[in-house]
Swiss-Prot record:
Protein's name according to its UniProt entry: Major sperm protein 19/31/40/45/50/51/53/59/61/65/81/113/142
Keywords, alphabetical: Acetylation, Cell projection, Cytoplasm, Cytoskeleton
Protein encoded by which gene: msp-19
Organ and tissue specificity: Sperm.
Note: Around 30 MSP isoforms may exist in C.elegans.
Subcellular compartments: Cell projection, Pseudopodium; Cytoplasm, Cytoskeleton
Domain MSP: 9-126
High-level lineage: Eukaryota, Metazoa, Ecdysozoa, Nematoda, Chromadorea
Length: 127
């Protein structure tokens, strides 16, 4: 069963953080790429620390080995300097899909006792 093998690595482009630049009086969209660099099919889900300000599309999916997906990370307009942005980040969570599973995302893959890996991408706001 796939769950007994720890999920392999993913790569993100950018690799360490996401940067949004002022002005913040309109919605910004930034694209990141997630690449499944492992030899197994994975399911991924994206979480944000501030759901009012940050959105990700598509928020989840399935990637075959070596497959990549482009995600649109959006930042809604907000009053820069008047809201706490220190802890804003996006977290990519991924896990191996069960053997024989269809290539369709299932939330329950993350709720069992299988291993889930995480990668945090802090968000930096340039004034």
């Amino acid at each position: 069963m796939a769950q007994s093998v720890p999920p392999g690595d993913i790569q993100t482009q950018p690799g360490t953080k996401i940067v949004f630049n002022a002005p913040y009086d309109d919605k910004h969209t930034y694209h990141i790429k997630v690449i499944n660099s492992s030899a197994r099919r994975i399911g991924y889900g994206i979480k944000t620390t501030n759901m009012k300000r940050l959105g990700v599309d598509p928020p989840c999916g399935v990637l075959d080995p070596k497959e990549a997906v482009l995600l649109a990370v959006s930042c809604d307009a907000f009053a820069f300097g008047q809201e706490d942005t220190n802890n804003d980040r996006i977290t990519v969570e991924w896990t191996n899909t069960p053997d024989g599973a269809a290539k369709q995302f299932r939330r329950e893959w993350f709720q069992g006792d299988g291993m889930v890996r995480r990668k945090n991408l802090p968000i930096e706001y340039n004034p």
